[in-house]
């Protein structure tokens, strides 16, 4: 059964820390972490060691902030 996971964190090592929030529809929290590390490392050219995860939480469909994820879930 899939669940929606919200990851809050920051990228350190740049001029200023960059705060981010990402939401994923995954089976395991580990899958969400791996996807987040891959996306953030690719987009911002940072190593995994420079990405600090502050919070990982499972959320309900009503709490989704990402409009693309929300529309995708509405289709099913």
Swiss-Prot record:
Superkingdom of the organism of origin: Archaea
Keyword rRNA-binding among record annotations: yes
Protein's UniProt keywords contain S-adenosyl-L-methionine: no
Biological processes annotated in GO: translation
Record keywords, A-Z: Ribonucleoprotein, Ribosomal protein, RNA-binding, rRNA-binding
GO MF: large ribosomal subunit rRNA binding; structural constituent of ribosome
GO terms for cellular component: ribonucleoprotein complex; ribosome
HAMAP family xref list: Ribosomal_eL20
Family: Belongs to the eukaryotic ribosomal protein eL20 family.
UniProt-listed NCBIfam families: PRK00773.1-1
Subunit structure, interactors included: Part of the 50S ribosomal subunit. Binds 23S rRNA.
Protein name: Large ribosomal subunit protein eL20
Gene it is expressed from: rpl18a
């Amino acid at each position: 059964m899939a669940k929606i996971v919200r990851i809050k964190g920051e990228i350190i090592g740049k001029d200023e820390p960059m705060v981010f929030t990402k939401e994923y529809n995954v089976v395991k929290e580990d899958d969400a972490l791996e996807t987040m590390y891959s996306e953030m490392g690719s987009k911002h050219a940072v190593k995994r060691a420079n990405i600090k995860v502050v919070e990982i939480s499972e959320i309900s469909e009503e709490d989704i902030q990402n409009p693309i994820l929300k529309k995708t879930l509405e289709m099913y």
